[in-house]
A protein has these predicted regions:
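Short linear motifs in intrinsically disordered/low-complexity regions
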Residues: 4-7, 73, 131
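Juxtamembrane/transmembrane-helix boundary motifs in multi-pass membrane proteins
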Residues: 5, 9-13, 102-106, 110, ...
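Short hydrophobic "helix-edge" motifs at membrane interfaces and signal-peptide entry regions
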Residues: 8, 77, 140-142
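Hydrophobic alpha-helical transmembrane segments
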Residues: 16-20, 112, 141-146
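Membrane-interface coil-to-helix junctions
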Residues: 26-125, 146-153
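Transmembrane-helix signature of polytopic, membrane-embedded enzymes
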Residues: 126-149
Length: 153
């Protein structure tokens, strides 16, 4: 049994390194910028505050039985949000973590949700690169996986 655990750990280790590097970069950025939970700032700049944050609030309301997933009565005279829900990745399984967050901390929790998504983006990209380019050197695959996860941030 112990041997199986060691084999599994050895297989998973290369996949965990890109995620760990991404997490370190994100945490250092959050700390240096004083972004919640390491300070009072938030990452709700520009369109994040106008588009993404209200969708997180709408998703929170849906998960707690207070709203429809596809229609929002709080925007104008009501609006169909199905395109927005899909375009802004609101149906990501990682957003289920939002269920655990109190509604008054949605804006602050966006930094944590973003960090979690970025870590898994780097792991997924490493898996893709490892599958498509198995002969590519490990540091190169790791570097590109980390760069991919950070390119949208």
């Amino acid at each position: 049994m112990k041997e199986k655990v060691n084999v599994l750990a050895k297989k998973l280790k290369p996949y965990s390194i890109p995620g760990a590097i991404t997490l370190a970069v994100v945490l250092i950025t959050l700390i240096l910028k004083g972004i919640w939970p390491f300070g009072g700032n938030r990452i709700d700049y520009f369109d994040n505050m106008q588009q993404v944050a209200p969708l997180y609030a709408h998703l929170w309301d849906f998960m707690h039985g207070k709203a429809s997933l596809w229609f929002d009565w709080y925007t104008g005279l009501g609006t169909n949000v199905s395109m927005s829900i899909s375009a802004f990745s609101m149906l990501s399984p990682f957003n289920l973590l939002l269920y655990l967050v109190p509604r008054n901390l949605i804006l602050e929790s966006i930094s944590i949700l973003t960090a979690v998504k970025m870590v898994f983006m780097s792991v997924a990209m490493y898996a893709l690169l490892n599958h498509k380019f198995p002969k590519l050197l490990y540091p190169v695959k790791t570097a590109f996986a980390v760069m991919y996860s950070l390119c949208g941030y």
